Amino acid sequence: SSLTMMPMSLEEIAQAVQGRLIAGTAAVNTPVATSAFTDSRQIVEGSVFVAIAGERVDGHDYVPHVGAQGAVAAIVDHEIADAGVPQIVVEDTVLALGALAKHNIERRRALGTPFTVVGITGSVGKTTTKDLMKALLSHMGPTVAPVGSFNNEIGLPLTSLKVNAETRFLVAEMGANHVGEIANLTSLVPPDIAVVLKVGVAHLGEFGSAERIAQAKSEIIHGLVPGGLSVLNANDEHVA
């Protein structure tokens, strides 16, 4: 389906996230993973469940239940006793999610068929622009874009893990709530085209000045693939 990633073996995933694969008794032949989720309710046949400890909910609590939904593995930061699925143990599951997404995009690029990543950042208008881009690009080929405003170190990888061999365009919304965040996101998913919208004062508290914000936004341009294209807002003194 359109929501699947590039198919990967558990060994390949463990290598991509630099994790330790604990097969346990659950390893029957070599299951192939075709999707990855952090929300246990979205798990389907062939999914990898990435357990993330949030403020209210710890994904590790759900690891024993995802096997019944068809999960082929769980990525965890500690071994779960009654997991029922193979586990890939890593130090940080959020970083592992990013590493898996990065590997998925590299796998897609390695096919050599046309594939373009459009990265969008700015304080104002990201989601509207993303929705317009998706509407336009969908006429030209299968397009993956975030649902809602998935633009952080969890949302961007989850969106990127919906890219597969059929995908022609990935619209990647990149939030910038602190200096270095966009550089981190572009290291996971280097854009071919970077769009920098208005740099507003929405996040001045954390950044300190419009110049600092502009610097953060410029990280998306430095994160471009070689020969990439940047689209700037000529009306914004902090961008152009």
Feature locations, PLM:
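Short, Lys/Arg-enriched N-terminal segments with co-localized hydrophobic residues
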Residues: 1-5
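Short, basic phosphate-binding NTP loop
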Residues: 7-119, 128-139, 154, 161
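Bulky hydrophobic/aromatic packing residues
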Residues: 8, 67, 169, 239-240
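Phosphate-binding loop of NTP-binding sites
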Residues: 96-234, 238
